Amino acid sequence: MVCEGKRSASCPCFFLLTAKFYWILTMMQRTHSQEYAHSIRVDGDIILGGLFPVHAKGERGVPCGELKKEKGIHRLEAMLYAIDQINKDPDLLSNITLGVRILDTCSRDTYALEQSLTFVQALIEKDASDVKCANGDPPIFTKPDKISGVIGAAASSVSIMVANILRLFKIPQISYASTAPELSDNTRYDFFSRVVPPDSYQAQAMVDIVTALGWNYVSTLASEGNYGESGVEAFTQISREIGGVCIAQSQKIPREPRPGEFEKIIKRLLETPNARAVIMFANEDDIRRILEAAKKLNQSGHFLWIGSDSWGSKIAPVYQQEEIAEGAVTILPKRASIDGFDRYFRSRTLANNRRNVWFAEFWEENFGCKLGSHGKRNSHIKKCTGLERIARDSSYEQEGKVQFVIDAVYSMAYALHNMHKDLCPGYIGLCPRMSTIDGKELLGYIRAVNFNGSAGTPVTFNENGDAPGRYDIFQYQITNKSTEYKVIGHWTNQLHLKVEDMQWAHREHTHPASVCSLPCKPGERKKTVKGVPCCWHCERCEGYNYQVDELSCELCPLDQRPNMNRTGCQLIPIIKLEWHSPWAVVPVFVAILGIIATTFVIVTFVRYNDTPIVRASGRELSYVLLTGIFLCYSITFLMIAAPDTIICSFRRVFLGLGMCFSYAALLTKTNRIHRIFEQGKKSVTAPKFISPASQLVITFSLISVQLLGVFVWFVVDPPHIIIDYGEQRTLDPEKARGVLKCDISDLSLICSLGYSILLMVTCTVYAIKTRGVPETFNEAKPIGFTMYTTCIIWLAFIPIFFGTAQSAEKMYIQTTTLTVSMSLSASVSLGMLYMPKVYIIIFHPEQNVQKRKRSFKAVVTAATMQSKLIQKGNDRPNGEVKSELCESLETNTSSTKTTYISYSNHSI
């Protein structure tokens, strides 16, 4: 035999030498009767091998242990049952009988490898030239059975070990229970197929179950060996690929656990208490001992077990551990109970089942009796009568893998049937081409089979020899002190889970959690722990940020704020200054009083227009000034009214116009007085532009500058309304408001009022210059007091208005400050300049008479005397200077005979 360079990395010489040595050894040591003492042989045209765990693993040094009734005898009999059915079927392998050679693996991979050498004996060239009988004759060897295919094994570790040798001899193998993902590697296990889905499908189903239950933090527990380790590896890989499930810790159960090992495992699992879910890929015995350890440590109800098909719906692992196992979710390839097998197995007796060499041992174990003196049981146990019956005198429940054993045998039979149809068309029995079956060719037919299995489900294989994944999902439940594995769903490439049918330990009404961190509240984002994506800290989206997704927060648009739970944004409420607001009531009240007072003054002046006091006040400029005062009061209503384009236009026009009217008139007055007295110091000629018409022209020229500025403002930046969200963007979004207002910035406001303030300052300067003019000649002093007070008002206005930039009440404070300042300025002018005159007109009409006409010469004399007495004013009381000035003016006036220009109609 030569090496298969393309298939194997090394020459199979070692296996051949081992097999040959084993064959020679057995030939020398065994008699014919002993050869088959531990195997079942049924003759046929085509022989199929079978590997079953008839016995459990023995103690140290002993290959086999106690009998396994269900996993061993039930499955073994299922193969014999299937062989009988096929041999009876006239349409399947007609005129061809199948035989079997069934071996016991004793649940140990090394022992199974030794036993499986029996299957390749016929393929090993025998050299017995050195072997002689006692009489010198050559020995006569029994011709070994030629095995065309093998059914088995059960455990993945056993199948892997056996598959390595069967592939060397091109013997196809179909397993009924091995689910390790490793066996899907078609480059290493190319002659291996199975009628059960691999654990990769099972792992996918378990990941889907964990995800459906909202668990993202789990631990894994595996029995040492291919099945457990491969299953956990597949689960870990799939969970890593899809994300959302993290492994808290992975524990492994040793093949030979030490005393107390299982308690240590439970304690280690408790180190991550939030990972309540435990994914188990463990053998039946390990499952039972884990549950025992959890019970011993009083952990009932803590762990949420997710068991693989090795747990399935078996009673043995949970026997006397019911409370610990309650709520366990287990998975099992979809199966059905085969009624035909039940009838077959119940009819088995010692008399009709002699082909099963282990049936007598099963009989003793099943009925608790002893068969004669050669039985294996103790002598004090009752003797078997042979009249016992299965299911009548003992409990019976069909083992879960019986269906798959039958399907595996039928898969081999259908492959042989199709092969016979192609290679031996019309031939009865085996034709020469099938006298020696080519294993590689048979493998092709196996992978191509497609039939309805014993449970009515399709049996097929993919390119790797795997069956499709179909699983039933169970939950171990306790109801009224009775226990059951209840079907709660199924998995066929996707999960179908009846969550409402699930029941948990201690009657928990909600699904128990197995998460590293609890879900964040609405409005909080996850800040994951580095290296552990399923663990996180919750951080609230602060300020104007809202939760976009579970990992991030984003800032709301300028016109929006987070909603109550910060999962989205909502429009910020829009506000404006309402008429009923305290911030509006006070300015409006002051403005109304001012308008009433101004109207009263205007009416009084109009009514007494030709009286000396009104004429002496300068009627034309007085009406201009009163108009400005009226506008200063009126602007309050425009500033409080709801903004729109028209209101904003009026605000721009009248915001500075009232002040401009007032201070333009006052400036013209003070300038006239100043020029008259300055001119009087130099000559007796009257200065220019002191007539009423000239004064009006000057006043309206000054006002036109303001109007021109407003016009330019209209052109450059047409009036419109805006919603200012930054003005009241408070730290607390709940208090944020959008302010509906005209688009008048602080800079625009300064520019609008700046010209009026310039007029006010200039007027104040003239008032200071004319402060020494005799009060009998002019209004310089009242104007001066008015301007001083007005300056104080506006100096107070500036810090209040511009110091509220960061205040939540900015709009209210600024509007109220501006309107009240303008009303106060108007009130000062009205009160100091006109209320005394109105008082005289109304209450002292006798004083409203003309005392004398003032000539410009008198003004010149007054100005000259004023200049001379300025120096004396530093050393003498003001009263004396004033008296002297007045006496001089009286004398001068009475002695003058010169013609003079009368100013009685022109206020100085």
From Swiss-Prot:
Membrane topology per record: Multi-pass membrane protein
UniProt-annotated location(s): Cell membrane
Transmembrane segments: 584-608, 621-641, 648-668, 696-716, 747-768, 782-803, 819-843
Keywords: Cell membrane, Disulfide bond, G-protein coupled receptor, Glycoprotein, Isopeptide bond, Membrane, Receptor, Sensory transduction, Signal, Transducer, Transmembrane, Transmembrane helix, Ubl conjugation
GO terms classed as biological process: adenylate cyclase-inhibiting G protein-coupled glutamate receptor signaling pathway; adenylate cyclase-inhibiting G protein-coupled receptor signaling pathway; G protein-coupled glutamate receptor signaling pathway; regulation of synaptic transmission, glutamatergic; visual perception
Cytoplasmic side, ranges: 609-620, 669-695, 769-781, 844-908
Gene3D superfamilies linked: 3.40.50.2300, GPCR, family 3, nine cysteines domain
Disulfide bonds: 64-106, 246-534, 369-384, 424-431, 516-535, 520-538, 541-553, 556-569
Signal peptide bounds: 1-33
Covalent link (Glycyl lysine isopeptide (Lys-Gly) (interchain with G-Cter in SUMO1)) residue numbers: 882
Gene Ontology molecular-function annotations: G protein-coupled receptor activity; glutamate receptor activity; group III metabotropic glutamate receptor activity
Glycosylation site positions: 95, 298, 452, 480, 565
Assembly: Interacts with PICK1.
Function comment: G-protein coupled receptor for glutamate. Ligand binding causes a conformation change that triggers signaling via guanine nucleotide-binding proteins (G proteins) and modulates the activity of down-stream effectors, such as adenylate cyclase. Signaling inhibits adenylate cyclase activity.
Protein name: Metabotropic glutamate receptor 8
Organism: Homo sapiens (Human)
Lineage: Eukaryota, Metazoa, Chordata, Craniata, Vertebrata
Protein encoded by which gene: GRM8
